[in-house]
Amino acid sequence: MFDHTTVLLKETVDGLNIDPDGVYVDCTLGGAGHSEYLVQQLSDKGRLICFDQDMTAIENAKIRLAPYIERVTFIHSNFRYLKEELLAHGFEQVDGILYDLGVSSPQLDTPERGFSYHHDAPLDMRMDQTATLTAFEVVNQWAYEDLVRIFFRYGEEKFSKQVARKIEEARKSAPIETTGQLVELIKEGIPAAARRKGGHPAKRIFQAIRIAVNDELGAAEDSLVDAIDMINVGGRISVITFHSLEDRLCKTIFKEASSLPELPPNLPVIPDDMKPTLKLITRKPIVPSDEELEVNNRARSAKLRVVEKINDKGRE
């Protein structure tokens, strides 16, 4: 079973200000925790559209959401194609969209998926198992300079060059095939003093490779921009992020869309096309309560941001 403890459940869904007759999108179906709580609040006129690029998640969600299946549409797709998929399914605008970014617990806990540095498994890390690029290709075929770039940019790893050099040296003699082999090379590349603090030494490198394999930041940016366009005025977007790169991206997009541009002095009235598109519902991100962290330690880095659309200037 795709067993996953849902993070910030009520805060995320309640933040959407659910209209029972509305149309809502869960861009990251996963274990269907958010979807189940949301669909329970919908009337027979309401609709929930669930995206996931992992077919296992969709198949399991169909079982979990069986009592409400008449209100649910499942879309097997990366959420970066949010706009085109919604339009293809006949939805021109929706009333709310939620995102729970990052890897779901079942993906982490299934060794053969290759996401976890705690299990020895083939280097994979694909969220969409039909995709072609895997962690094996990144680790064994990408140039030293490209490895340094992703380790530093996506993993914020101070020892990016040292780790990339260890990988480059090791793969000359034989391919690096497993997560266990990669973990050992990472440990060799990071000085002992640095390894003793800041959690598992492989955490940042694995994050960087995972983001590169799945183009997570590019997909999130594309999707969030489309989400702003696709929601009705009064509709909301809830986004849970799990690391600073995701949160920074989300914060930047929302800040830009909720800010006034530079205006000429003494302008008597602000034209509609210059007014902000969004209003920030959460000035500062919502974080899990102590009670939630007691039962789900994986939620410790989660941050929730919620915005509301107040101007439809972007639509034709």
Curated annotation (Swiss-Prot):
Recorded catalytic activity of this chain's protein: cytidine(1402) in 16S rRNA + S-adenosyl-L-methionine = N(4)-methylcytidine(1402) in 16S rRNA + S-adenosyl-L-homocysteine + H(+)
Q: Which Pfam families match?
A: Methyltransf_5 (PF01795)
Q: Which Gene3D superfamilies match?
A: Putative methyltransferase TM0872, insert domain, Vaccinia Virus protein VP39
Physiological role? Specifically methylates the N4 position of cytidine in position 1402 (C1402) of 16S rRNA.
Cite the entry's keywords alphabetically: Cytoplasm, Methyltransferase, rRNA processing, S-adenosyl-L-methionine, Transferase
Q: What is its EC number?
A: 2.1.1.199
List the coiled-coil residues: none
Methyltransferase among the record's keywords? yes
One GO CC annotation = cytoplasm
Where is this protein found? Cytoplasm
Q: What coarse category fits the chief subcellular location reported for this protein?
A: cytoplasm
Write out the residues that bind S-adenosyl-L-methionine: A32, G33, H34, D52, F79, D100, Q107
Name by which UniProt lists this protein: Ribosomal RNA small subunit methyltransferase H
Which family does the record assign? Belongs to the methyltransferase superfamily. RsmH family.
**Which PANTHER family does the entry link to?**
12S RRNA N4-METHYLCYTIDINE METHYLTRANSFERASE (PTHR11265:SF0), S-ADENOSYL-METHYLTRANSFERASE MRAW (PTHR11265)
Highest taxon listed in the record's lineage:
Bacteria
Q: Does the keyword Cytoplasm apply?
A: yes
Read off the NCBIfam families from this record. 16S rRNA (cytosine(1402)-N(4))-methyltransferase RsmH
Tell me which Gene Ontology terms the entry assigns under biological process.
rRNA base methylation
**What top-tier enzyme class does this entry carry?**
transferase
Single GO molecular function: rRNA (cytosine-N4-)-methyltransferase activity
